[in-house]
Amino acid sequence: MSRKTRILSAFVLIALAACGGGTGPYGSKSPPPPPPANTVAATAGLAFTPNPLTVNSGENVTFAFGAVAHNVTFDTPGAATPADIPGNNSNVSIQRTFTTSGTYRFHCTIHPGMAGSVVVR
């Protein structure tokens, strides 16, 4: 190997070593916190997950809306059915309390076919 090739190889190795491995002056980026228990996420893939979500009577359910706007309209309104979540909700989480046992089906009026349910024990 010529002297020129060795110098070039050493330079490349030093440059590569300088590019990786460190966290930089700002430290490492921590992972996002896990979603709270009893959360229904409205995904960018136009699905509610998990589906169904099973909870105990009296528990809160958090509907987490990401960057894509969604809403929640319950299919069977009634005294025990929580209030709908109207509008175009994005980057926000909204809670509803389920006080009576049963299956509560809901859908997004913005995205036809996007539906989910909460089963209350």
Regions found by a protein language model. Give the residues of each.
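Sec-dependent bacterial lipoprotein signal peptides
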Residues: 1-18
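Extracytoplasmic copper-binding redox domains, predominantly the cupredoxin/blue-copper superfamily
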Residues: 2, 19-121
